[in-house]
Design a protein with these regions (language model features):
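A ubiquitous short alpha-helical element
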Residues: 71-75, 93-98, 120-124, 176-185
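Short linear motifs at protein or domain termini
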Residues: 1-95, 229-232, 243-259
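Short, flexible helix-adjacent loops and helix caps
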Residues: 17-21, 89, 93-97, 117-121, ...
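Short, solvent-exposed amphipathic helices
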Residues: 80-83, 132, 223-226
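Residue-level marker of regulatory loop/turn positions in helix-turn-helix DNA-binding domains and
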Residues: 1, 25, 66, 129, ...
Length: 259
């Protein structure tokens, strides 16, 4: 169970991302205590965490100024994530034989293949694919032999589309037969890349594993750019609806949304 300050930081972070707390808005400990009905200690600790994440900046006196990330910030962070995951794949390929970890990777590939063969594109199926995809990517991250790679990824994982192993869907196209076929093709292509990455790691081919992982993750930037072209007023909250993130992680409560 998360501590009170961690839970509070998540609530404030969500409100910043959804714009309930506006960019450049000044917030104080007293104000947040009242808004979230908590004492000063968890507020102070939550603000320190959010400051490290770059979502708030300490101003003059005791106040903070909100620094809501932009779409460009997300694109830049996705590029960083791509380099880190590519590095993790290369480093894992250089590690001594990891039969158990390789077995986990292969199991995720097989499970995704099975789901794609019977896919109906309902929420339950997509969620299962998302889970197996996350296990695949996190297994590489956690077994690369360099804890700082995983640590650095965790520092940006609070942002939309920045969770390791997150999948991206344009749900607007899933209402058409052509859109479903195109999405299935993309998922099959992604899992075929998983197979190449896994085989390269198993063979100790660090160059191949790194290159394929980078190609595999380039799709995230391409999708953000595609969403920007289709929506000139693209916001972070819009971006979340395109990702595999469970909206309950970010979505304001009904009471908050009505304010």
């Amino acid at each position: 169970m998360d501590s009170i300050d961690t839970e509070l930081a998540a609530r404030i972070r969500r409100d910043i991302i959804f714009g309930t707390i506006k960019n450049s808005e000044r917030v104080s400990e007293a104000q947040l205590c009242e808004s979230y009905n908590v004492s000063r200690t968890p507020v102070r600790l939550a603000l320190r965490l959010l400051e490290r994440e770059g979502l708030v900046k300490r101003g003059e006196g005791r106040g903070y100024h909100v620094q809501s990330p932009s779409i460009q910030d997300i694109k830049q962070a996705v590029l960083v994530l791509g380099h880190l995951e590519s590095l993790a794949a290369r480093l894992m390929a250089q590690q001594p034989k990891q039969n158990e970890s390789i077995s986990i990777l292969k199991n995720q590939i097989d499970e995704i293949d099975h789901l794609l063969s019977t896919l109906t594109f309902d929420d339950a199926s997509l969620q299962l694919i998302q889970q197996h995809n996350a296990v695949f990517h996190k297994t590489i991250m956690e077994n690369c032999g360099n804890n700082f790679v995983n640590f650095t990824c965790n520092q940006i994982s609070h942002l939309p589309m920045l969770e390791v192993g997150l999948m991206v869907f344009d749900k607007s196209v899933l209402s058409t037969e052509e859109g479903v076929e195109r999405s299935i093709f993309r998922l099959k292509l992604g899992n075929s890349q998983h197979k190449v990455i896994c085989e390269a790691i198993e063979k100790g081919d660090s160059v191949r594993s790194e290159g394929m992982m980078r190609e595999h993750l380039n799709i995230l930037v391409e999708y953000i750019e595609l969403f920007e072209k289709s929506d000139e007023k693209l916001t972070l909250s819009n971006l979340i609806t395109y990702s595999g993130i469970e909206l309950s992680t970010f979505e304001p409560t009904k009471k908050e949304a009505s304010n």
